[in-house]
Design a protein with these regions (language model features):
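Low-complexity, intrinsically disordered segments with a bias for serine/threonine
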Residues: 642-648
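Short, intrinsically disordered C-terminal tails of secreted or membrane-associated proteins
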Residues: 650-657
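Structural and coupling elements of P-loop NTPases
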Residues: 1-609
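Compositionally biased, low-complexity flexible segments
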Residues: 627-634, 643
Length: 658
C-alpha cells in the first residue's frame, strides 16, 4: 500500500482553555506563513466575534502549514463540552490528533471525552503537555494522570507508547524532554511527521469524499469541506451525492471550484487527490454527512454518530408590548427558516415543530450551546422569546432516565464544605476529592443535568469568583427525584411606562433590580429579584406626588443601588417555568409568560382549585373503600343492623359528592 508522504492531517484536541488556538498560532508563525514585519493578532484562528469576546473556540477551523516539504493540515477544535459535536465530526478528516493537556490542571472532563472519540476511530495520539512555564506546573504528575486516563479508556499497548512533548505555546517553544533547552516548536513538528501516519495514496481508485463541515459565502453560497478518501477531483467534474442515512437517495451535481487550505487562506486549485482536505463550491444543497462519489462506486461513507442533545427550550415569536420595535426579523416564518438553516451546519442541534405555529422546540448540548445560537440570531436582527431550559428525559424499560453530568471543580479548600452541601441538595454525588495542591482542591461529582441549571451563578458567588467548574455529559441514569427550586423570586412590574427614580427607590427595598431610571418597562416584566423567595409586584414607574406644600428643608436626593446586569447565560439560569426571555437586537428582558397580573392570579387559583378537587375525589374514594370494608367485615349492614340507616346516609353522601 502506498502513502502520500507529502501530507499529514491532524486535529488539535483538548479541554477548554488548555491552549489549542494559541498552539496553532505558534505553529503558523514558525512555519513562515506570516511576513516578518506582519502584525498578527493573538488567537488568530478565532475569527468569529463571539469567540473573541468569550475567549473560546466555538467552530472548528482548518489551516495548513508546510514543514520540511510536508504539508500539515491542522484543524483547531472547540474545547467546551457544549460544542463537542464539532470535534466528533471533524475527527473523520484526520489521520491523528495532538492531545493538549494543561501542565497544572491535568486531564479534565472534556479531555476524556475527546480522547475517547479518538480511540473509537483508532487515531494515533501525540500528547502535548502545555503551559509548562506556569509557576504551579506539575508536568511529571500530569503525564502519569494522562497514562491513567489511557488505561481507563482501554487504550492498546501501541497507544500507551504515544510520544509526549512538553511545550509553552504562549512562548512558542517545545521539547521532548523537560530538561532540554527549548527554542522553537521544531520538536513538535518533528514528532508530527514521525508519528502521525500519512494518508493512503488512492488517487487511481473511484472518487469519494465525506462532507464533514459546511461553510457559507455570500458570493458562492454553501461550501462543503472534507477529506478526499480516494480518487481525484477536478473542477467542473460531475459527481453523485449519496448519504448513509438516506438509503436509495442519490443526486447528480457538478463541482464548480476546488480549494485547498494554505495558512489562513484558501487557494483555488484545478484538481486534488486522495488524502487532501478540500473545500468545494457549486452544490446548492450540500449537507454534513453527505458523500460525494463517482458514477462507478456510489457506496456512501459512514458518518460518525453524533451524541444526542440533553437540553431543550422553546423559541417563539415575541408577543410582548414592545414586540417589533427594533427587530428586523420578527415573524414565525422567518424564525422557522433561521432555526432550520442552523441544522445544516450544526449537527448537534435538533429543531422540532410544536402544537403552536409560533413556537419551536430547540434541543442542544447545553446552556452555552443554545445561548450562542441565541446571541448569533440576536446580532443578525432576529427578535423572539425563549423559555426556561428543560432537561431531555428518556424512558428505558418503562422507567424514567435523566442525563447525568460529570462535574470537576477546582476551588480553594475553604469553600469545599459549601460546595459539597449545595451540590448534595441538587442530588450530586461526590465521586473523588483530591488532596489540596497549591491551595486548591479538586472535587468530582456525578449530578443530574437539571441540578446544574441555575447553579453556576450561585457557584461563583459562593467561591467569590475564585472557583473553576467544568462539566461534561456522562450517561443516562434513573431519575433522582425532585430538586429544590431557586431561593430568590422575581420582582414584577404591574404597570407599563418609564422607570422613575422614585419608583425604583421604593422597589430596591425589596431586592436587587435589573432596570435603571429612564428605561421602558411593561406590565409583567421582571424588573428584579427578591431574596425572600416570594414573588412581589411593584410599580417602578411611580412618580412622587407633587403638591403646593413645601417642606421647611429641602428633599433628600434619592440614591439608587447599581443595577444588576445579567448575562444571557445567567438569565437562562434565573428564569422559572412561567417566565420567558424576550430577545431583541439591542437587549433582552425577562418577563412573565402571562403578562397580566389578574390573569396570572386567575391561573394560579385555577391550578389550586383543580389540585383541591383532585384531593377531594381521592379522599372520597378512599373513604368509600374503607367504610365498606369495615361495615361488610362486621356485617353492620344486615337488615336488622342498627347501622342500616347510617349506610344509606353514607352512600347518599358519597354518591352526591357532599
Amino acid at each position: 500500500m502506498n502513502y502520500r508522504e507529502d501530507i499529514r492531517n491532524i486535529a488539535i484536541i483538548a479541554h477548554v482553555d488548555h491552549g489549542k488556538t494559541t498552539l496553532v498560532d505558534a505553529l503558523l508563525k514558525q512555519s513562515g506563513i506570516f511576513r516578518k514585519n506582519q502584525v498578527v493578532n493573538e488567537r488568530v484562528m478565532d475569527s468569529n466575534a463571539i469567540e473573541r469576546e468569550r475567549g473560546i473556540t466555538i467552530l472548528s477551523k482548518n489551516t495548513a502549514v508546510h514543514y520540511n516539504g510536508v504539508k500539515i493540515n491542522i484543524i483547531d477544535t472547540p474545547g467546551h463540552a457544549d460544542f463537542g459535536g464539532e470535534v466528533e465530526r471533524v475527527l473523520k478528516m484526520v489521520n491523528g490528533v495532538v492531545l493538549l493537556v494543561d501542565a497544572f490542571e491535568g486531564p479534565m472532563p472534556q479531555t476524556k471525552f475527546v480522547l475517547k472519540k479518538s480511540f473509537e476511530l483508532n487515531l494515533p495520539v501525540i500528547v502535548c503537555i502545555n503551559k509548562i512555564d506556569r509557576p504551579e506546573a506539575r508536568p511529571e504528575e500530569v503525564v502519569d494522570e494522562v497514562l491513567d486516563l489511557f488505561i481507563e479508556l482501554g487504550a492498546s499497548e501501541d497507544v500507551l507508547d504515544a510520544p509526549f512533548v512538553y511545550a509553552s505555546a504562549k512562548r512558542g517553544v517545545a521539547g521532548k524532554k523537560l530538561d532540554e533547552e527549548m527554542t522553537s516548536m521544531e520538536p513538535l513538528f518533528q514528532t508530527i511527521l514521525n508519528y502521525i501516519p500519512a494518508p493512503v495514496e488512492a488517487s487511481n481508485e473511484s472518487f469519494k469524499l465525506l462532507i464533514s463541515t459546511i461553510d457559507y459565502n455570500d458570493y458562492v453560497g454553501r461550501i462543503g469541506i472534507g477529506k478526499i478518501e480516494s480518487g481525484t477531483l477536478k473542477e467542473n467534474d460531475s459527481v453523485y451525492i449519496v448519504n448513509s442515512t438516506k438509503p436509495g437517495y442519490e443526486e447528480k451535481v457538478k463541482i464548480s471550484k476546488i480549494y485547498e487550505f494554505e495558512g489562513l487562506e484558501r487557494d483555488e486549485v484545478e484538481s486534488s487527490s486522495s488524502g487532501s482536505i478540500v473545500a468545494i463550491t457549486g452544490i446548492e444543497d450540500i449537507n454534513i454527512g453527505d458523500t460525494l462519489t463517482s458514477e462507478q462506486d456510489k457506496e456512501p461513507l459512514e458518518f460518525v454518530k453524533i451524541s444526542e442533545p440533553t437540553l431543550s427550550m422553546n423559541f417563539s415569536v415575541n408577543d410582548s408590548p414592545f414586540a417589533g420595535k427594533v427587530g428586523k426579523f420578527v415573524t414565525s416564518r422567518q424564525l422557522r427558516q433561521r432555526l432550520f438553516r442552523e441544522l445544516q451546519t450544526d449537527v448537534s442541534l435538533r429543531v422540532e415543530e410544536t402544537n403552536s405555529t409560533d413556537s419551536f422546540k430547540v434541543s442542544g448540548r447545553g446552556e452555552l450551546h443554545l445561548s450562542v445560537l441565541i446571541e448569533n440570531m440576536r446580532r443578525e436582527g432576529y427578535e423572539f422569546q425563549v423559555s426556561k431550559p428543560q432537561v431531555l428525559f428518556k424512558t428505558i424499560d418503562s422507567k424514567k432516565y435523566e442525563p447525568i453530568e460529570r462535574v470537576t471543580i477546582d476551588v480553594s479548600s475553604e469553600y469545599v464544605g459549601a460546595i459539597i452541601e449545595k451540590l448534595g441538595r441538587r442530588k450530586g454525588e461526590l465521586v473523588t476529592m483530591q488532596e489540596p495542591q497549591g491551595g486548591y482542591q479538586r472535587l468530582e461529582f456525578l449530578i443530574p443535568a437539571r441540578g446544574l441549571i441555575g447553579y453556576r451563578t450561585e457557584f461563583m458567588t459562593d467561591t467569590k469568583g475564585n472557583g473553576i467548574l467544568n462539566s461534561v455529559f456522562e450517561d443516562y441514569a434513573p431519575y433522582k427525584g425532585d430538586i429544590p427550586r431557586r431561593v430568590n423570586a422575581s420582582i414584577v412590574s404591574f404597570d407599563t411606562g418609564v422607570a422613575s427614580t422614585y419608583g425604583l427607590n421604593n422597589a430596591q427595598q425589596r431586592g436587587s433590580l435589573f432596570v435603571g431610571p429612564g428605561e421602558e418597562v411593561y406590565e409583567g416584566q421582571v424588573v428584579g429579584e427578591s431574596p425572600k423567595g416570594v414573588e412581589i409586584e411593584v410599580s417602578v414607574t411611580k412618580e412622587k406626588k407633587q403638591t403646593n406644600v413645601r417642606a421647611s428643608g429641602s428633599d433628600e436626593a434619592l440614591k439608587l443601588l447599581p443595577v444588576k446586569n445579567l448575562t444571557l447565560e445567567e438569565a437562562l439560569e434565573f428564569i422559572e417555568d412561567d417566565e420567558l426571555i424576550e430577545i431583541t437586537p439591542e437587549d433582552f428582558r425577562i418577563r412573565k409568560e402571562i403578562l397580566s397580573s389578574q390573569q396570572r392570579y386567575k391561573s394560579k387559583n385555577k391550578k389550586k382549585w383543580f389540585y383541591a378537587k383532585d384531593i377531594f375525589w381521592c379522599n372520597k374514594i378512599f373513604c368509600t373503600i374503607l367504610f365498606n370494608n369495615i361495615f361488610n367485615k362486621y356485617n353492620f349492614f344486615s337488615s336488622s343492623s342498627v347501622f342500616s340507616k347510617e349506610k344509606t346516609y353514607f352512600n347518599l353522601a358519597v354518591g352526591n359528592g357532599n
